[in-house]
Amino acid sequence: MRKSFYTWLMAQRNPKSNEPVAILADLAFEDSTFPKHTDDFEEVSRYLEDHASFSFNLGQFDQIWEDYLAH
């Protein structure tokens, strides 16, 4: 079974980085309602589009998701 996206994303945290994955990781870490136990693209994407307490470029999210799938 694949690690959840959130678990993988937390390994990408780096407050000193300007890389999109590090920025998303920090934003997700601060968002208590971010879906933490899923590896489903649609669920995470829908959350970012409709419910996130922050704004993030969804084009960058697509690339981050591809990186997640590659690991």
From Swiss-Prot:
Top-rank taxon, per record: Bacteria
Database matches in InterPro entries: UPF0346, YozE_SAM-like, YozE_SAM-like_sf
Protein family according to the UniProt entry: Belongs to the UPF0346 family.
Family annotation (NCBIfam families): PRK13672.1
HAMAP family: UPF0346 (MF_01538)
Protein name: UPF0346 protein stu0441
Organism (species): Streptococcus thermophilus (strain ATCC BAA-250 / LMG 18311)
